[in-house]
């Protein structure tokens, strides 16, 4: 009989969002009349920007003409898209990022997991707690951890607690680690990182030969000009960081699938024989072997993000969700709840009322208000007693959900 990857058996029962779906579906079947509003999973609701739609329609027409037809594209992505990303997202902010260092993919979630293919099995890995579950689960799947304890913490990972006491920004560890996952604006807490804070992490990584895996999927929601959008705005980051970005939230590409990862040339890791090896070459080899690239049609849609029309439309889209976040913040605060995030991020992080666990509050919100959020404990042990509310929904649904919560007096 064929053997399996036993590391999958170490995963906690049910990925967070499928477990939420299971509970919601069970409630819906028992209460078919309930008008459930979903503010849980971070999926967008508003239509694709017109500029992106028009570009994809034209790309479909291209595929119907022999002279414009495209077959397999470059595994790294088309140069015309990578060049626009480099110029607009990085060089315009003073970041030394070349188009050749950008790899187009079908999602930053995929890249955050796939990047582990180029790293060894003996690295000391640091994650915040709470944390986006993908960072932890993909390391478990890859065999980088031991078993989970009663708190759901895996042996072999270094957990860095984030809480209201440290403004939801982890303290730099006193011990040496090799891989560091940072996500800003943060999922799930909505916290942001100052330039000084990121500089401290870069200094630590360079001093310890560590690599920062920087998830900037929500950078478009930053409105404070003092907050960096990229780790590469920080001096020295090219020597110690890889950055993940996505078109999912700023341009509504969750169902269209397009993202990118920046691996600086010159960034190095250590081989078993002690020699230093450039990570760009390893990632390029990995992508060329395991990935056939994002479709031409989708990449044309992503390229349109950088047109004048596209820029105006995605700014409008981001502003729409940020206004939702403002409404959620203000209404939950008025309801007597302790609220964080939701200013430079699309997520609001709420302290559960006294005596309620995260899942207790989930069930109460679902049953009493017919509103779905995400239990903080699903993001890690330190998330217990918190709850994430997403701003990704229609204005009508957000307003209705907040009215229900205020009327229920859940605080």
Curated annotation (Swiss-Prot):
- Record's family? Belongs to the class-I pyridoxal-phosphate-dependent aminotransferase family. LL-diaminopimelate aminotransferase subfamily.
Taxonomic lineage from the root: Bacteria, Bacillati, Cyanobacteriota, Cyanophyceae, Synechococcales
UniProt catalytic activity:
(2S,6S)-2,6-diaminopimelate + 2-oxoglutarate = (S)-2,3,4,5-tetrahydrodipicolinate + L-glutamate + H2O + H(+)
GO BP: any one term = lysine biosynthetic process via diaminopimelate, diaminopimelate-aminotransferase pathway
Which Gene3D superfamilies does the UniProt entry name for this protein? Answer: Aspartate Aminotransferase, domain 1 (3.90.1150.10), Type I PLP-dependent aspartate aminotransferase-like (Major domain) (3.40.640.10)
- Positions annotated to bind substrate: 15, 42, 109, 132, 187, 292, 388
Q: What does this protein do?
A: Involved in the synthesis of meso-diaminopimelate (m-DAP or DL-DAP), required for both lysine and peptidoglycan biosynthesis. Catalyzes the direct conversion of tetrahydrodipicolinate to LL-diaminopimelate.
What's its top-level EC category? transferase
Q: Which residues cross the membrane?
A: none
| UniProt key word GTP-binding | no
Q: What is its EC number?
A: 2.6.1.83
Q: Does the keyword Manganese apply?
A: no
Residues annotated for pyridoxal 5'-phosphate binding in this entry: 72, 108-109, 132, 187, 218, 246-248, 257, 292
The source's domain of life comes to Bacteria
The record's annotation in InterPro entries points to: Aminotransferase_I/II_large, DapL/ALD1, PyrdxlP-dep_Trfase, PyrdxlP-dep_Trfase_major, PyrdxlP-dep_Trfase_small
Mind listing the UniProt keywords for this protein, alphabetically? Aminotransferase, Pyridoxal phosphate, Transferase
Query: What is this protein identified as?
Result: LL-diaminopimelate aminotransferase
Q: Which cofactor does it need?
A: pyridoxal 5'-phosphate
Identify the CDD domains for this entry.
AAT_like (cd00609)
Please name the pathway: Amino-acid biosynthesis; L-lysine biosynthesis via DAP pathway; LL-2,6-diaminopimelate from (S)-tetrahydrodipicolinate (aminotransferase route): step 1/1
Gene (UniProt): dapL
Tell me, what is one Gene Ontology molecular-function annotation carried by this entry?
Answer: L,L-diaminopimelate aminotransferase activity
Q: How does it assemble?
A: Homodimer.
**Sites of N6-(pyridoxal phosphate)lysine modification:** 249
